[in-house]
Structures are given as C-alpha cells and as structure tokens.
C-alpha cells in the first residue's frame, strides 16, 4: 500500500517511485519511512526498471542500474522492485542463503527474465526443487486485455503458454500474467 508517507496529490502518500514525477526529496523521505517501519537492515537496492531480462547482483552492485531483477547472497542486503500492474516475484533457495526479486511484466516474462534470474542467481547446480517462489499482487486476467502482438510473442517463446490467453473477441485476449509466470 501507499499509506503513511509524505507524498501529496496523485502520489499520495507513500510513493516509493522516483520515476513518476514526484519530488525526489519526498521520495527519499518515503523510502526512509519504509526502511524504518519495516525494520529493514539497509536501504533497498533500487533499480531503474526497463521491462527486460537483465538482473543485477545487489550485494556487489551498490548503485541501482537498469535491471528488472536483483539478487543477493549476503545477509542484510535488501532487494526491491516496484510494480503496479506487473508481477513481483520473490525467489529464494530452501536454505534461505540466496534471495531474489523480479519485476515481471509481459515484456520481461516474454524475454525470459525469470529464467535468466534463476540461472544467474542460483546457478545451474541448484535443482528446481530447491527454489521457492512467491507471486505477488498484479493485474488479473479479467482486467488485462492484450492483442495478437503480445499473444504471438509469448507463444513463439513458449508454446505451452496457450492457457495464459482467453479470447474475448476477434484479436483480443485476456492475459493471465500469473499463468505465464508459472
């Protein structure tokens, strides 16, 4: 939610996004409020999200760069993404030694952001049964209508994604972001 911050107007009140036109000093105050109220051990590693397949190792890259995923293998490193309609995905290994967060919109999912993040962050030596994933709040299929460009892009990459699309009329489908992420 955005309750409890200091932003006003259309950004009211706990806006954490520095990319939407809110005053940067107010966004910084909101981010400090988040750290304090959530008892975070450090400021999150904020990213410049670009709806693509790139991720960064947050315990190595201190400054946020253009990426849609961040992971850490060190304690007290906070990974974060911002979402509205897009799907936030939280990942960790069963031992809790590695964590990741992914900003997964249709472009990122279609370009393989989840697969690439898992490969980079966990490596190929960890079996899939050792990975835990949580899918956060995102736009649901009843509210997400897409055209053939999105559908065709997904099916070209992953033909098994046909269950992510329900045709509502000629050239328009409801898109299930959750099903496509699974």
Task: Give the role of each language-model region.
Residues 1-182:
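Active-site microenvironment for binding and transforming phosphate-containing groups
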